[in-house]
């Protein structure tokens, strides 16, 4: 791995400047330093530096080990065929560790995995080999659009959080936001079966209270996401459960339902997987 990756892989100031040079020039130094502490920049870079010889799936596995995070996997039906092409879809309760666990587990069973992620995560360069960036807040760059399409046309297994953002407190329960139908459309187009999964876990009460307050105040920017690195480090030594349901053949996604209706049906299957393990 090159020296640039080993020295510093997350730089808040660089990220802000890359997204909005004008904002970067206006932000006082103490605000940037506060954000660095808030997202645990030094701790994240220490993790990456300690594992400088690893990237992709191996790095995700090493980070879980260093954080003493473990997980148990439960199947409710037949396991995915190692020779198949799949889109693995899951709820998104945590915003960090859930993705790491999916990369580590699915990557240990298939030789090639790709994760559809917010393009901001591409600044974590050692994990870039498994990431496929999408811009959730604006227009996608042409090269990223091409990579997105090429990934679905490839033989790589695809990991996908259809909600995009991590779960929020909805009607008193931690639940995903609305799932987007894109994965259904792409499954049909690329002839991939879909594997519904459910991931246990939730963030702190403060995270959900801040999200609720932000919404009440009419603030559109998801400021609570700045807390996600802290939520990750708070879960050192934790154990989680991953429930994997029966693969859904893309050929079964017929015109009987719209793509959005199929999306909602598969979401229900994902949440039901936790109650159907053998």
Set out the residue ranges of the language-model regions.
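Membrane-anchoring hydrophobic helices of lipid-metabolizing enzymes
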Residues: 1-89, 99-101, 110, 128
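Non-catalytic C-terminal accessory region of glycerolipid acyltransferases
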Residues: 2, 12, 145-278
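Catalytic core of membrane glycerolipid acyltransferases/transacylases, capturing the structured
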Residues: 41-43, 86-140
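Structural motif corresponding to alpha-helix initiation and N-cap regions
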Residues: 57, 142-145
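Short, conserved catalytic or adaptor-binding loops enriched in Gly and charged residues
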Residues: 61-65, 124-125, 233-236
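Short, flexible loop segments at the rims of nucleotide/cofactor-binding pockets, characterized by
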Residues: 63-69, 134-140, 172-173
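Short gly/ser/thr-rich secondary-structure transition/capping motifs
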Residues: 67-74, 140-142, 224-226
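Conserved beta-strand termini and adjacent loop/short-helix elements that scaffold enzyme active sites
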Residues: 74-76, 116-118, 134-135, 245-247
């Amino acid at each position: 791995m090159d020296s640039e990756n080993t020295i510093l892989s997350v730089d808040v100031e660089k990220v802000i400047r890359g997204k909005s040079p004008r904002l970067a020039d206006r932000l006082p130094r103490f605000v940037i330093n506060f954000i660095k502490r808030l997202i645990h920049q030094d701790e994240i870079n220490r993790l990456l530096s300690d594992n400088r010889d690893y990237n992709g799936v191996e790095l995700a596995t090493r980070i879980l080990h260093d954080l003493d995070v473990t997980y148990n996997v439960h199947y409710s039906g037949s396991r995915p065929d190692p020779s198949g092409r799949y889109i693995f879809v899951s709820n998104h309760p945590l915003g960090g560790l859930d993705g790491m666990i999916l990369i580590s587990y699915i990557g240990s069973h298939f030789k090639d995995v790709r994760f559809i992620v917010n393009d901001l995560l591409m600044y974590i360069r050692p994990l870039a080999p498994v990431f496929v960036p999408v811009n959730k807040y604006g227009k996608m760059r042409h090269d990223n659009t091409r990579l997105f399409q090429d990934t679905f046309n490839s033989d790589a297994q695809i990991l996908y959080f259809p909600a995009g953002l991590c779960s929020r407190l909805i009607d008193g329960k931690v639940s995903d936001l609305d799932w987007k139908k894109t994965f259904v459309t792409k499954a049909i187009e690329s002839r991939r079966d879909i594997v519904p999964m459910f991931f246990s876990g939730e963030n702190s009460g403060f995270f959900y209270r801040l999200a609720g307050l932000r919404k009440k105040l009419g603030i559109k920017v998801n400021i609570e996401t700045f807390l996600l690195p802290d939520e990750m480090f708070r879960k050192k030594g934790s154990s989680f459960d991953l429930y994997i349901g029966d693969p859904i053949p893309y050929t079964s996604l017929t015109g009987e339902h719209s793509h959005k209706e199929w999306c909602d049906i598969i979401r229900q299957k994902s949440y039901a997987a936790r109650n159907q393990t053998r």
